C-alpha cells in the first residue's frame, strides 16, 4: 500500500496509485448545493488535497474519478475556468510580500484571459479577469483559495509598520485591508462566479477580511460535512485493515487492541454536534506506514503563530491539559508544547 504522505495533489495520488479515502460524494454535494463556502480545519488535515480534488472536478477531469463515488453522481463533467490560489508556500513577515503574491496570481490569470482596459488595482484587475474568463469560455469561474489566513497569521505579532497614503499602520492591518479588498471581488463579480471555496486553520471576525462580500457558508461545524477532511473509524477499518493487522503483530496485540491504541493516540477530533470521531490523517498514515505510534503531527503541524504567542506567557500545563507533567510545568518553550499535540 502506497501512503500519500506529504502529497497534496489529487491528480498525483490517483495517477501514481496512492491510497485514497474517497470523499468525492461530499465534493459533489459541495459543488451542486451551494456557491460560496468557508472551511476551517487544523493543519495537516487534508485541506489542500480537498482543494486539489475540487480543482480536478471543476476542470472536468472525469478520468481521475473513475470508480469513486462521484463517478456515478456526475453526468456532465463541464470544464470551468479555475483560479487556484494557495498562500501555503509563502512567508509573509516581510512588507509587501502579499502584494507581490497577489500581483503574480492576477498577472498569470491575465496572461490567459486578458486584462481589463481600465483595471488598475489588484481587486479591479481580478474582477476583470473573472469577467473575461466567463466571456471567453462561456462558463462562470471557480475560485479556490487555500490557507487564506496565512498572510495574517504570519504577522499576528509583528511590530513592523508600513507607511500608506493614510499614515502608518501595522503590517497585520495592512495585510488584512489588502485581503479585504481582494475578497470583495466575490461580491462585485457574483454574476461571473460559479463556485468559491476558502479554507484555512482559523476564522477571523465577521468584520475583518470577509466583510467586503456576502458572508460565505461556513461549513466548519456542519454535520453534513464534518467528515469532509480527516478519516473516520469506519473508513480506517475499511481501507486500512491489512496494515493495522500487520502493525498489531509488531506490537504483540490482537487487531482490536491495535485499533484501540490508534484510537487513543489519533482519534478524538469532532467537527459538529453529531460528535463523529475523526482521526488525524497525517498522523494515522505515518503510523501505519512506519508501524510505529508517535507524535507525527507535532513535528510539522504545530501552528507557529500559536507558539509565538504562547512564548509571551507562562501557562500551567496541568490547567491546559489535565495531565501531570513533572519538571515541565510551564509552557515557555517549543518542545513543551508537544504535550498538547497528538
PLM features: residue spans?
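Phosphate-binding site recognition
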Residues: 1-342
Amino acid at each position: 500500500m502506497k501512503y500519500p504522505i506529504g502529497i497534496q495533489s489529487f491528480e498525483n495520488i490517483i495517477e501514481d496509485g496512492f491510497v485514497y479515502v474517497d470523499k468525492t460524494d461530499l465534493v459533489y454535494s459541495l459543488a451542486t448545493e451551494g456557491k460560496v463556502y468557508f472551511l476551517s480545519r487544523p493543519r495537516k488535515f487534508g485541506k489542500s488535497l480537498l482543494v486539489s480534488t475540487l480543482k480536478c472536478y471543476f476542470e472536468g477531469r472525469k478520468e481521475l474519478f473513475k470508480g469513486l463515488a462521484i463517478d456515478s453522481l456526475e453526468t456532465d463533467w463541464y470544464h470551468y475556468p479555475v483560479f487556484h490560489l494557495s498562500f501555503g508556500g509563502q512567508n509573509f513577515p516581510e512588507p509587501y510580500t502579499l502584494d507581490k503574491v497577489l500581483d503574480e496570481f492576477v498577472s498569470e490569470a491575465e496572461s490567459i484571459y486578458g486584462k481589463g482596459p481600465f483595471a488598475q488595482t489588484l481587486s479591479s484587475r481580478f474582477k476583470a479577469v473573472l469577467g473575461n474568463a466567463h466571456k471567453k469560455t462561456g462558463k462562470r469561474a471557480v475560485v479556490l483559495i487555500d490557507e487564506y489566513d496565512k498572510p495574517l497569521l504570519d504577522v499576528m505579532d509583528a511590530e513592523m509598520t508600513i507607511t500608506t497614503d493614510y499614515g502608518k499602520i501595522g503590517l497585520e492591518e495592512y495585510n488584512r485591508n489588502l485581503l479585504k479588498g481582494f475578497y470583495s471581488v466575490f461580491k462585485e463579480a457574483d454574476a461571473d462566479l460559479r463556485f468559491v471555496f476558502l479554507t484555512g486553520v482559523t476564522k477571523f471576525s465577521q468584520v475583518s477580511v470577509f466583510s467586503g462580500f456576502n458572508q460565505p457558508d461556513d461549513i466548519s461545524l456542519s454535520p453534513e460535512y464534518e467528515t469532509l477532511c480527516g478519516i473516520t473509524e469506519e473508513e480506517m477499518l475499511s481501507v486500512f485493515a491489512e496494515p493495522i493487522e500487520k502493525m498489531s503483530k509488531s506490537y504483540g496485540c490482537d487487531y482490536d487492541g491495535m485499533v484501540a491504541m490508534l484510537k487513543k493516540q489519533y482519534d478524538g477530533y469532532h467537527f459538529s454536534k453529531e460528535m463523529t470521531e475523526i482521526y488525524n490523517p497525517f498522523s494515522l498514515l505515518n503510523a501505519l506506514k512506519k508501524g510505529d505510534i508517535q507524535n507525527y503531527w507535532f513535528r510539522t503541524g504545530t501552528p507557529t503563530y500559536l507558539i509565538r504567542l504562547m512564548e509571551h506567557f507562562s501557562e500551567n500545563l496541568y490547567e491546559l491539559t489535565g495531565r501531570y507533567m513533572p519538571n515541565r510545568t510551564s509552557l515557555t518553550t517549543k518542545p513543551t508544547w508537544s504535550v498538547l499535540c497528538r
